[in-house]
Amino acid sequence: MFCIALVLAACSDPKPILRTDLPKATALVLYKAERRMYLFQGNTVIKEYDFKLGFAPIGHKKFEGDGKTPEGQYFIDRKNPNSQFHLSVGISYPNAADRRAAGTRSPGGDIFIHGTPRPYRFFFKDWTWGCIAVSNREIEEIYAMVDIGTPIWIYP
């Protein structure tokens, strides 16, 4: 019985490590085609990460359920320490232009940069519904380095 408890404990998602020793980012810049994210402090890149996108990654998000990740200028508008994807930081999609472009359809929302649903899980292909996914270790760093209000530019 004790061995089963140890195995189950080893498989559970460990508590996020909220680091305080990292510099604060003043901006995030993402290039979807390259799957590359850069965290800046002023004009200096202080961290960079690879990421995965939605299941239909090409093009700007137009409506809920299209599997696309938005493109354009947004900002970090919330942080979720209780995310089902380890930790997450919210992106301010949709903005007024996104809502107009969606017309009568819902533009969707709840676009986040987040970790994975299980520890040590690695994805070889795009898998989200439009979010930006990194490893759990990486989202712990990003979560600590960005504040609400940090601007984010997402390029094709």
Predicted regions: what is each one?
Residues 34-36, 73, 110:
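Structural motif
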Residues 21-23, 30-32, 44, 69, ...:
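Short, surface-exposed loop/turn motifs at beta-strand boundaries within globular domains
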Residues 17, 23, 78-156:
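Exported/periplasmic cell-wall-interacting domains
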Residues 50, 61, 68, 111, ...:
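Short glycine- and Lys/Arg-enriched binding-loop motifs that mark or flank ligand-binding interfaces
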Residues 8-10:
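C-terminal motif of bacterial Sec signal peptides marking the signal peptidase cleavage site
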Residues 14-26, 53-77, 93-96, 136-137:
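N-terminal post-signal-peptidase region of extra-cytosolic proteins
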Residues 1-3:
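Sec-dependent signal peptide recognition
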